[in-house]
Amino acid sequence: MNIDNDLLSKNKEAKVVSENSTVEINDVTNSDSKNTDNDFQTEELNNFEKIFLNLNSDLLNQQLLVKNNLKLYKIRAEKEINRAYKFSLKSFISSLFPVIDSMEYALNLFKKDDKILCLIFNELDNVSQSLMNLLVKFGVTSIKDINIAFNPDIHQAITTQVSKDIKNNYVISIMQKGYLLYDRLLRPAMVIVSKNDI
């Protein structure tokens, strides 16, 4: 029986040692597993942080883009409003040109030696000047200069005239004034252009 007890005792010791080894192995395995889990979690956190930073950067870039687009839109809208304001009177002003032309033509026909006609002339001249001052107030300028180079953007040549005194391709005479509304041509000036004798 002693042998059996010894065997039994050794068996129990082996079992205890075996259990302790298993516990130690399990502890080491659990420790390694916990370290692996911690490393994995840290890596995941780092990945999430990178993703978050990228998304944040993208959102900031989009915010700047939207701000810039709004600024550009505001600038364009202001330009359109200014342009619409400047040129809103274009058709009205253009319809006044025949009246102005008729008044100027009538003023050129007057003989200045008759007193009554002279009074009428002065009144018509005042009306004409008042009308032109009003147009200038709204940004209209007349094209009436002579002895300047012919410019097809603002002049329309009716005919040419041979001249030795004036340079070739210069405006000799204005037959009908032209008009600009700010920088936009409303009507070209009808002109006679010089031509050198060849």
Curated annotation (Swiss-Prot):
GO terms for molecular function: adenyl-nucleotide exchange factor activity; protein homodimerization activity; protein-folding chaperone binding; unfolded protein binding. Pfam families: GrpE (PF01025). Keywords: Chaperone, Cytoplasm, Stress response. Its main location: cytoplasm. Disulfide bonds: none annotated. It is found in: Cytoplasm. GO terms for cellular component: cytosol. It comes from the Bacteria. One of its GO terms (biological process) is protein folding. InterPro entries: GrpE, GrpE_coiled_coil, GrpE_head. PANTHER family: GRPE PROTEIN (PTHR21237), GRPE PROTEIN HOMOLOG, MITOCHONDRIAL (PTHR21237:SF23). Belongs to the GrpE family. Homodimer. Participates actively in the response to hyperosmotic and heat shock by preventing the aggregation of stress-denatured proteins, in association with DnaK and GrpE. It is the nucleotide exchange factor for DnaK and may function as a thermosensor. Unfolded proteins bind initially to DnaJ; upon interaction with the DnaJ-bound protein, DnaK hydrolyzes its bound ATP, resulting in the formation of a stable complex. GrpE releases ADP from DnaK; ATP binding to DnaK triggers the release of the substrate protein, thus completing the reaction cycle. This is Protein GrpE 1. The gene is grpE1.
